[in-house]
Amino acid sequence: MFSFKLSLTLSLNSLAFCMASKKFFTLQEANSFIPQLLEWVPQIQKLATSLNKDFPDIKNAREKAKWSGGSEQGVSYLNAVLKYNNLMHKVEEMGCEVKGIREGLIDFPSIREGREVYLCWRMPEKEILFWHDLNTGFAGRKPI
């Protein structure tokens, strides 16, 4: 009984901390990030396409790496992965959530009428024009 109470208390405290540390955006705050996203998202999209298409030798390199083999594409691939991860980290560090990089779809947690929702942005929109409930996704977008 004691360990269950302690575990439950720790879990609830962790949940409360996560909720308290989660960033919520006003429409104005979220819109202030759009110019940066308009620059970064196309770069991320290009890198994602490149990682999926331009490195056919990587699968073989991964298999050979088990036996100390390698690939001429290895260094280029790792550089692309590092750039991709760096840009994704910058976007996520803002506090927004990447929902689909191929579509250029990013959500900003927000509070609307006392409940948590997402301000929904999609490339190449110049500002956030839509929002949706947490469980409806892009299909549930509503005009602001």
Per-range role (PLM):
Residues 6:
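Cationic, low-complexity basic patches in intrinsically disordered or flexible, solvent-exposed regions
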Residues 40, 47, 54, 61, ...:
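Amphipathic coiled-coil alpha-helices
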Residues 2, 14-61:
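Long, hydrophobic N-terminal alpha-helical segment
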Residues 25, 32, 46, 68, ...:
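A structural signal for alpha-helical segments
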Residues 65-68, 79, 83-89, 100, ...:
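Interaction interfaces in information-processing and related assembly proteins
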Residues 53, 57-60, 64-67, 93, ...:
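Heptad-repeat coiled-coil alpha-helices
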Residues 89, 93-144:
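Glycine-rich, aromatic-bearing surface loops/beta-hairpins
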